[in-house]
């Protein structure tokens, strides 16, 4: 049995993936992978995801230059979630979110309202052309 066969895939053939910064342990983003994306990620050492909105493979950083170098690939106890320990690279290292922030998890629930608690490191309009 292949290591890919040991993953518990959804009915759509996907697995949820959390990208975590390998040095700080900050959670950077959540995404999905299909079998091909996970195999390519392991082969290339860079994160490749499945974009559900585009219906295609998405090499992280293909447009922005903010590539994720993969240091470790882990699965949880049920083999139904993948954890990537990554180094977030790019023209301005540390940007993982398409909003120009370090993490996609920049909104904090406080007093019944969502508040942005991380700064924009680079204007997204200058990242995506």
Swiss-Prot record:
Cofactor remark: Binds 1 Mg(2+) ion per subunit.
Signal peptide start and end residues: none
Binding site residues for Mg(2+): 76, 78, 80
Gene Ontology CC terms: cytoplasm
Catalysis performed (reactions): 1-(5-phospho-beta-D-ribosyl)-5'-AMP + H2O = 1-(5-phospho-beta-D-ribosyl)-5-[(5-phospho-beta-D-ribosylamino)methylideneamino]imidazole-4-carboxamide
Keywords: Amino-acid biosynthesis, Cytoplasm, Histidine biosynthesis, Hydrolase, Magnesium, Metal-binding, Zinc
Annotated binding of Zn(2+), by residue: 77, 97, 104
Localization: Cytoplasm
UniProt KW Metal-binding keyword: yes
Main localization of the protein described in the UniProt heading: cytoplasm
Protein EC: 3.5.4.19
Listed GO biological process terms: L-histidine biosynthetic process
Pathway(s) served: Amino-acid biosynthesis; L-histidine biosynthesis; L-histidine from 5-phospho-alpha-D-ribose 1-diphosphate: step 3/9
UniProt cross-references to Pfam families, sorted A to Z: PRA-CH (PF01502)
One Gene Ontology term of the molecular function aspect: zinc ion binding
Entry superkingdom: Bacteria
NCBIfam families associated with the record: PRK00051.1
Known function: Catalyzes the hydrolysis of the adenine ring of phosphoribosyl-AMP.
Subunit-structure text: Homodimer.
Family membership noted in the UniProt record: Belongs to the PRA-CH family.
Name listed for the protein in its UniProt record: Phosphoribosyl-AMP cyclohydrolase
Organism field: Leptothrix cholodnii (strain ATCC 51168 / LMG 8142 / SP-6)
């Amino acid at each position: 049995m292949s290591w890919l066969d040991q993953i518990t895939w959804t009915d759509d053939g996907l697995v949820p993936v959390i990208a975590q910064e390998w040095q700080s342990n900050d959670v950077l983003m959540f995404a999905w992978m299909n079998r091909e994306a996970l195999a390519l990620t392991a082969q290339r050492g860079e994160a490749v995801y499945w974009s559900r909105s585009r219906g295609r493979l998405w090499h992280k950083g293909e447009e922005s230059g903010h590539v994720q170098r993969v240091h470790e690939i882990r699965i949880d106890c049920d083999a139904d979630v993948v954890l990537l320990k990554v180094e977030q690279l790019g023209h301005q290292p540390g940007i993982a979110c398409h909003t120009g922030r370090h993490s996609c998890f920049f909104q904090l629930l406080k007093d019944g309202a969502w508040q942005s608690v991380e700064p924009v490191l680079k204007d997204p309009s200058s990242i995506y052309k």
